[in-house]
């Protein structure tokens, strides 16, 4: 626990553009899921030099609270996504980092 009493053991936030069409499905237990990729680009200072930062990360949204927000997500739209990260092993055996969204904010 930090001095500010915040629990941030696995907290991740990223601003980026939606890179592909969201894929929606429902689990056998009836939970709605939405998956899409978010692409981030920025310039950051590191050791006195400017470097380009770029990443493309899978965003997983689950449950009724946020699923309604996903209905208006379109390719190219800029979003702030806050949540926690997990690793998922794909069918080809590669590990992929996934950001599980707990908060989504549309940026105009």
Swiss-Prot record:
Q: Where is the SSB domain?
A: 8-108
Q: Name one Pfam family in it.
A: SSB_1
- Entry GO CC: primosome complex
| Top-rank taxon, per record | Bacteria
What GO biological process term is on the record, naming one? DNA replication, synthesis of primer
What InterPro entries does the database record attribute to this sequence?
NA-bd_OB-fold, Primosome_PriB/ssb, Prisomal_replication_PriB
Indicate whether DNA-binding appears among the record's keywords.
Answer: yes
What keywords sit in the KW lines? DNA replication, DNA-binding, Primosome
Cite a single GO MF annotation: single-stranded DNA binding
Q: How does it assemble?
A: Homodimer. Interacts with PriA and DnaT. Component of the replication restart primosome. Primosome assembly occurs via a 'hand-off' mechanism. PriA binds to replication forks, subsequently PriB then DnaT bind; DnaT then displaces ssDNA to generate the helicase loading substrate.
Family per record: Belongs to the PriB family.
Function text: Involved in the restart of stalled replication forks, which reloads the replicative helicase on sites other than the origin of replication; the PriA-PriB pathway is the major replication restart pathway. During primosome assembly it facilitates complex formation between PriA and DnaT on DNA; stabilizes PriA on DNA. Stimulates the DNA unwinding activity of PriA helicase.
The name on file for this protein is Replication restart protein PriB
Q: Which organism is it from?
A: Histophilus somni (strain 2336) (Haemophilus somnus)
Name the lineage: Bacteria, Pseudomonadati, Pseudomonadota, Gammaproteobacteria, Pasteurellales
């Amino acid at each position: 626990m930090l001095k500010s009493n915040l629990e941030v053991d696995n907290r991740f936030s990223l601003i980026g553009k939606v890179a592909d069409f969201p894929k929606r499905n429902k689990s056998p237990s009836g939970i709605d899921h939405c998956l899409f990729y978010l692409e981030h680009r920025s310039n950051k200072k590191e050791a006195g030099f400017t470097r380009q930062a770029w990443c493309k990360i899978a965003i997983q949204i689950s449950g009724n609270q946020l699923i309604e927000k996903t209905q208006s997500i379109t390719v190219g739209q800029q979003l702030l996504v806050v949540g926690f990260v997990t690793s998922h092993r794909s069918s080809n055996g590669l590990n992929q980092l996934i950001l599980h969204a707990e908060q989504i904010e549309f940026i105009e």
